[in-house]
From Swiss-Prot:
Coiled coil: none annotated. It is found in: Cell inner membrane. This is Ferric enterobactin transport system permease protein FepD. Keywords: Cell inner membrane, Cell membrane, Ion transport, Iron, Iron transport, Membrane, Transmembrane, Transmembrane helix, Transport. Part of the ABC transporter complex FepBDGC involved in ferric enterobactin uptake. Responsible for the translocation of the substrate across the membrane. The lineage of its organism: Bacteria, Pseudomonadati, Pseudomonadota, Gammaproteobacteria, Enterobacterales. NCBIfam families: PRK10441.1. Residues 1-9, 85-92, 142-151, 214-241, 301-305 are periplasmic. The chain crosses the membrane at residues 10-30, 64-84, 93-113, 121-141, 152-172, 193-213, 242-262, 280-300, 306-326. It comes from Escherichia coli (strain K12). GO terms for biological process: ferric-enterobactin import into cell; iron import into cell; siderophore-dependent iron import into cell. The gene is fepD. Induction: Controlled in part by the amount of available iron. Induced by hydroxyurea. One of its GO terms (cellular component) is ATP-binding cassette (ABC) transporter complex, substrate-binding subunit-containing. It is a multi-pass membrane protein. The complex is composed of two ATP-binding proteins (FepC), two transmembrane proteins (FepD and FepG) and a solute-binding protein (FepB).
Length: 334
């Protein structure tokens, strides 16, 4: 390990943790109406009854927590996908998991009138799981291992089909379209803490699982044959990773809708900062992705008081950064 990488690693984690704290604080302070820090602190004291305190507790706190949960989930899911598929352009939408969750939620609303948070979460998990199983079955090869190329192709094909069906159902059913149009655009506008409580435990378990897979992912990134020679159980690692992706993507999609680009970009930035070792890149991704998502949400609230969707802002932020990272990597000969 070079000295520059060691120094970067020593700075990256505490620096990103501080950045995440700043993003969280600004998310509570800044919006269509900026509030002083004293009002935010008073709101958390439990004694404030003013309208400003209501804004903090009922509007900004839920969306801030949603950004933290969804950002962490999407970042880890993207990092897992890029390693499992050995495809640097993989993201949470590539394997069709987000599309499966979205399709299930829209289908449940159209056929059964599901509208509560619990019902939508259940449909999201079911859709994500079914999509993952279909892709895993289609992308499997001899010995029960997953072929990265077949896995990627199966995911792209399934995502295209499900996204088309989702749009068709929503457009043909005006009630469903009105109910889910903001969610389909990708937004942190969450007003119910109960929804976040329901997905908190699954996200924490899946996130911890992803972090515990760090060593196995390091071996797998060298190739299946090399990983097997090093004593890694490739099929088990791929299966556990796929299940973690299912839970992370299903939870994030159920909370904030389909948000692209975040899971694609941030793992690249993490590897650029601290190297390809998953023991470092996964924690850095876990800290950096929620921070970026919160900053994107803040920018959307400031630019357009009527709420420019975070998915739009994240795409504008993410595209130039990713292009820079790709060009830098190309010049370095990697």
């Amino acid at each position: 390990m070079s000295g520059s990488v060691a120094v970067t690693r020593a700075i990256a984690v505490p620096g990103l943790l501080l950045l995440l704290i700043i993003a969280t604080a600004l998310s509570l302070l800044i919006g269509a109406k900026s509030l002083p820090a004293s009002v935010v602190l008073e709101a958390f004291s439990g004694t404030c009854q003013s309208a400003d305190c209501t804004i903090v507790l009922d509007a900004r706190l839920p969306r801030t927590l949603a950004g933290l949960l969804a950002g962490g989930a999407l970042g880890l899911a993207g990092a897992l996908m890029q390693t499992l598929t050995r495809n640097p352009l993989a993201d949470p939408g590539l394997l069709g998991v987000n599309a499966g969750a979205s399709f299930a939620i829209v289908l449940g609303a159209a056929l059964f009138g599901y509208s509560s948070a619990q019902e939508q979460l259940a449909m999201a998990f079911a859709g994500a799981l079914v999509a993952s199983l279909i892709v895993a079955f289609t992308g499997s090869q001899g010995g029960g291992q997953l072929s990265p190329v077949r896995l990627t192709l199966a995911g792209v094909a399934l995502a295209a089909v499900l996204e088309g069906l989702t749009s068709g159902i929503a457009l043909l059913n005006p009630d469903v379209y009105d109910q889910l149009r903001f969610w389909q655009a990708g937004s942190l506008d969450i007003r119910n803490l109960h929804t976040l409580k329901v997905v908190l435990i699954p996200v924490l378990i899946a996130g911890a699982t992803a972090l515990l897979l760090s060593r196995a992912l390091n071996s797998l990134s060298l190739g299946s044959d090399t990983a097997t020679a090093l004593g890694s159980r490739v099929a088990r690692t791929q299966l556990i990773g796929l299940l973690a992706i299912t839970v992370l993507c299903g939870s994030a999609t159920a909370i904030v809708g389909p948000i692209a680009f975040i899971g694609l970009m941030m793992p690249h930035m993490a590897r650029w900062l601290v190297g390809a070792d998953h023991r470092w890149s996964l924690p850095v991704t876990l800290l950096a992705t929620p921070a970026l998502l919160l900053f994107a949400d803040i920018i959307g609230r400031v630019i357009v008081p009527g709420e420019l969707r975070v998915s739009v802002v994240s795409a504008f932020i993410g595209a130039p950064v990713l292009i820079f990272l790709v060009r830098r990597k190309t010049r370095g000969g990697a």
